[in-house]
Curated annotation (Swiss-Prot):
It catalyses: D-alanyl-D-alanine + H2O = 2 D-alanine; UDP-N-acetyl-alpha-D-muramoyl-L-alanyl-gamma-D-glutamyl-L-lysyl-D-alanyl-D-alanine + H2O = UDP-N-acetyl-alpha-D-muramoyl-L-alanyl-gamma-D-glutamyl-L-lysyl-D-alanine + D-alanine. Induction: Expression regulated by upstream promoter elements. Part of the probable VanC-type operon associated with vancomycin resistance. Bifunctional enzyme, exhibiting dipeptidase and carboxypeptidase activities. Catalyzes hydrolysis of the D-alanyl-D-alanine dipeptide. Cleaves the C-terminal D-alanine residue of UDP-muramyl-pentapeptide[Ala] (UDP-MurNAc-L-Ala-D-Glu-L-Lys-D-Ala-D-Ala). Shows no activity against the pentapeptide with a C-terminal D-serine residue. Together with VanC/VanC1 and VanT, required for vancomycin resistance in E.gallinarum strain BM4174. Belongs to the peptidase M15D family. CDD domains: DD-dipeptidase_VanXYc. This is Bifunctional D-Ala-D-Ala dipeptidase and D-Ala-D-Ala carboxypeptidase VanXYC. The gene is vanXYC. It comes from Enterococcus gallinarum. Keywords: Antibiotic resistance, Carboxypeptidase, Cytoplasm, Disulfide bond, Hydrolase, Metal-binding, Multifunctional enzyme, Protease, Zinc. Homodimer. Its EC number is 3.4.13.22, 3.4.17.-. A dipeptide binds at residues 67, 88, 93, 95, 102, 155-156. GO terms for biological process: proteolysis. The active site is at 153 (catalytic acid/base residue).
Length: 190
Protein backbone atom coordinates (compact mmCIF):
# COMPACT_ATOMS: atom_id res chain seq x y z
CA UNK A 1 0.00 0.00 0.00
CA UNK A 2 1.53 3.28 -1.13
CA UNK A 3 -0.03 5.66 1.37
CA UNK A 4 1.72 8.65 -0.21
CA UNK A 5 0.38 8.08 -3.73
CA UNK A 6 -0.72 11.42 -5.10
CA UNK A 7 -4.06 11.21 -6.86
CA UNK A 8 -5.63 14.22 -8.54
CA UNK A 9 -6.48 15.43 -12.05
CA UNK A 10 -2.75 15.75 -12.84
CA UNK A 11 -1.93 12.35 -11.31
CA UNK A 12 -4.81 10.01 -12.16
CA UNK A 13 -5.00 6.40 -11.08
CA UNK A 14 -3.45 3.80 -13.32
CA UNK A 15 -5.94 1.95 -15.51
CA UNK A 16 -7.80 -0.64 -13.40
CA UNK A 17 -5.89 0.33 -10.24
CA UNK A 18 -7.82 -0.91 -7.23
CA UNK A 19 -6.93 -1.52 -3.59
CA UNK A 20 -5.63 -5.04 -2.95
CA UNK A 21 -7.93 -5.70 0.00
CA UNK A 22 -10.77 -3.88 1.73
CA UNK A 23 -12.49 -4.35 5.08
CA UNK A 24 -15.73 -3.08 6.56
CA UNK A 25 -14.97 0.03 8.63
CA UNK A 26 -16.60 0.74 12.01
CA UNK A 27 -18.58 3.80 13.10
CA UNK A 28 -20.73 4.19 10.00
CA UNK A 29 -24.48 4.05 9.48
CA UNK A 30 -24.03 1.91 6.36
CA UNK A 31 -21.39 -0.34 4.77
CA UNK A 32 -18.20 1.64 4.22
CA UNK A 33 -15.03 -0.14 3.12
CA UNK A 34 -11.40 0.93 3.59
CA UNK A 35 -7.95 -0.58 3.29
CA UNK A 36 -7.29 -2.60 6.48
CA UNK A 37 -4.68 -0.26 8.02
CA UNK A 38 -6.89 2.77 7.34
CA UNK A 39 -9.89 1.10 9.02
CA UNK A 40 -7.71 0.11 11.98
CA UNK A 41 -6.34 3.64 12.48
CA UNK A 42 -9.80 5.19 11.99
CA UNK A 43 -11.16 2.95 14.76
CA UNK A 44 -8.19 3.71 17.04
CA UNK A 45 -8.64 7.45 16.48
CA UNK A 46 -12.37 7.44 17.19
CA UNK A 47 -11.98 5.33 20.34
CA UNK A 48 -8.97 7.29 21.66
CA UNK A 49 -10.86 10.58 21.33
CA UNK A 50 -14.09 9.14 22.76
CA UNK A 51 -16.05 10.33 19.72
CA UNK A 52 -17.98 7.10 19.11
CA UNK A 53 -21.31 8.84 19.80
CA UNK A 54 -20.46 12.09 18.03
CA UNK A 55 -19.01 11.32 14.60
CA UNK A 56 -19.56 8.81 11.83
CA UNK A 57 -17.89 7.61 8.69
CA UNK A 58 -19.94 8.96 5.79
CA UNK A 59 -17.91 7.51 2.93
CA UNK A 60 -14.74 5.60 2.13
CA UNK A 61 -13.87 3.39 -0.85
CA UNK A 62 -15.74 4.01 -4.10
CA UNK A 63 -15.45 2.16 -7.38
CA UNK A 64 -14.75 4.18 -10.52
CA UNK A 65 -18.36 3.51 -11.52
CA UNK A 66 -19.61 4.97 -8.21
CA UNK A 67 -17.32 7.98 -8.63
CA UNK A 68 -18.67 8.52 -12.14
CA UNK A 69 -22.25 8.29 -10.86
CA UNK A 70 -21.48 10.86 -8.12
CA UNK A 71 -19.85 13.20 -10.65
CA UNK A 72 -22.81 12.93 -13.03
CA UNK A 73 -25.36 13.39 -10.21
CA UNK A 74 -23.58 16.50 -8.93
CA UNK A 75 -23.25 17.86 -12.45
CA UNK A 76 -27.01 17.49 -12.99
CA UNK A 77 -28.03 18.80 -9.56
CA UNK A 78 -25.39 21.46 -8.89
CA UNK A 79 -23.79 22.42 -12.19
CA UNK A 80 -20.25 22.23 -13.50
CA UNK A 81 -18.63 24.94 -11.33
CA UNK A 82 -19.81 23.36 -8.06
CA UNK A 83 -18.99 19.83 -9.21
CA UNK A 84 -15.44 20.79 -10.19
CA UNK A 85 -14.97 22.37 -6.74
CA UNK A 86 -16.12 19.40 -4.66
CA UNK A 87 -16.10 16.20 -6.71
CA UNK A 88 -13.00 14.57 -8.18
CA UNK A 89 -13.19 13.30 -11.73
CA UNK A 90 -13.60 9.53 -12.08
CA UNK A 91 -10.12 8.01 -12.09
CA UNK A 92 -8.78 10.97 -10.09
CA UNK A 93 -10.37 10.25 -6.70
CA UNK A 94 -8.54 9.02 -3.61
CA UNK A 95 -11.74 7.27 -2.62
CA UNK A 96 -11.01 4.77 -5.40
CA UNK A 97 -8.02 3.34 -3.49
CA UNK A 98 -9.60 3.13 -0.03
CA UNK A 99 -7.29 5.67 1.64
CA UNK A 100 -9.76 8.57 1.87
CA UNK A 101 -12.56 9.05 4.38
CA UNK A 102 -15.42 11.51 4.61
CA UNK A 103 -16.49 12.19 8.19
CA UNK A 104 -19.74 13.70 9.46
CA UNK A 105 -21.40 14.51 12.74
CA UNK A 106 -23.91 11.93 13.98
CA UNK A 107 -26.51 14.60 14.69
CA UNK A 108 -26.51 15.52 10.97
CA UNK A 109 -28.38 12.45 9.72
CA UNK A 110 -29.62 14.20 6.59
CA UNK A 111 -26.07 14.95 5.53
CA UNK A 112 -25.19 15.65 1.94
CA UNK A 113 -22.96 12.85 0.60
CA UNK A 114 -20.93 15.38 -1.40
CA UNK A 115 -20.44 17.90 1.43
CA UNK A 116 -21.18 16.34 4.84
CA UNK A 117 -21.27 18.70 7.80
CA UNK A 118 -18.08 18.38 9.85
CA UNK A 119 -16.97 21.62 11.45
CA UNK A 120 -17.99 24.18 14.05
CA UNK A 121 -18.29 21.56 16.78
CA UNK A 122 -16.24 20.31 19.71
CA UNK A 123 -16.19 16.82 18.14
CA UNK A 124 -14.74 18.11 14.85
CA UNK A 125 -12.18 20.22 16.73
CA UNK A 126 -11.03 17.24 18.82
CA UNK A 127 -10.80 15.04 15.72
CA UNK A 128 -8.69 17.70 13.97
CA UNK A 129 -6.36 17.96 16.97
CA UNK A 130 -5.66 14.21 17.01
CA UNK A 131 -6.01 12.94 13.42
CA UNK A 132 -2.33 13.37 12.54
CA UNK A 133 -1.32 11.07 15.42
CA UNK A 134 -3.16 8.23 13.67
CA UNK A 135 -1.87 8.85 10.16
CA UNK A 136 -4.58 11.16 8.77
CA UNK A 137 -4.37 14.60 7.19
CA UNK A 138 -7.00 17.13 6.18
CA UNK A 139 -6.69 16.59 2.45
CA UNK A 140 -8.19 19.82 1.13
CA UNK A 141 -7.32 22.65 3.56
CA UNK A 142 -8.72 26.15 3.44
CA UNK A 143 -6.89 28.56 1.11
CA UNK A 144 -5.11 25.76 -0.78
CA UNK A 145 -7.48 25.29 -3.74
CA UNK A 146 -4.91 26.57 -6.24
CA UNK A 147 -2.60 23.77 -5.14
CA UNK A 148 -5.06 20.88 -4.73
CA UNK A 149 -7.59 21.80 -7.41
CA UNK A 150 -10.41 21.08 -4.92
CA UNK A 151 -12.17 23.55 -2.59
CA UNK A 152 -11.86 23.42 1.20
CA UNK A 153 -13.41 20.17 2.46
CA UNK A 154 -13.38 20.03 6.29
CA UNK A 155 -14.90 16.53 6.15
CA UNK A 156 -12.38 14.84 3.81
CA UNK A 157 -9.33 13.14 5.30
CA UNK A 158 -6.59 11.08 3.72
CA UNK A 159 -4.57 8.34 5.35
CA UNK A 160 -0.84 8.85 4.67
CA UNK A 161 0.55 7.08 7.75
CA UNK A 162 3.06 8.16 10.36
CA UNK A 163 5.27 10.19 10.47
CA UNK A 164 4.07 11.77 7.22
CA UNK A 165 0.76 12.92 8.71
CA UNK A 166 2.54 14.70 11.56
CA UNK A 167 4.99 16.47 9.23
CA UNK A 168 2.29 17.53 6.74
CA UNK A 169 0.02 18.83 9.51
CA UNK A 170 2.81 20.63 11.42
CA UNK A 171 3.98 22.36 8.23
CA UNK A 172 0.38 23.13 7.11
CA UNK A 173 1.15 21.50 3.78
CA UNK A 174 -1.05 19.71 1.30
CA UNK A 175 -0.08 16.29 -0.01
CA UNK A 176 1.03 18.05 -3.21
CA UNK A 177 3.37 20.31 -1.24
CA UNK A 178 4.75 17.34 0.68
CA UNK A 179 5.48 15.56 -2.60
CA UNK A 180 7.33 18.67 -3.81
CA UNK A 181 9.32 18.78 -0.56
CA UNK A 182 10.28 15.09 -0.84
CA UNK A 183 11.29 15.51 -4.50
CA UNK A 184 13.43 18.55 -3.64
CA UNK A 185 15.08 16.67 -0.76
CA UNK A 186 15.90 13.72 -3.02
CA UNK A 187 17.40 16.09 -5.64
CA UNK A 188 19.60 17.70 -2.97
CA UNK A 189 21.11 14.36 -2.02
CA UNK A 190 21.29 12.83 -5.49
Amino acid sequence: MNTLQLINKNHPLKKNQEPPHLVLAPFSDHDVYLQPEVAKQWERLVRATGLEKDIRLVDGYRTEKEQRRLWEYSLKENGLAYTKQFVALPGCSEHQIGLAIDVGLKKQEDDDLICPHFRDSAAADLFMQQMMNYGFILRYPEDKQEITGISYEPWHFRYVGLPHSQVITAQKWTLEEYHDYLAQTVRQFA
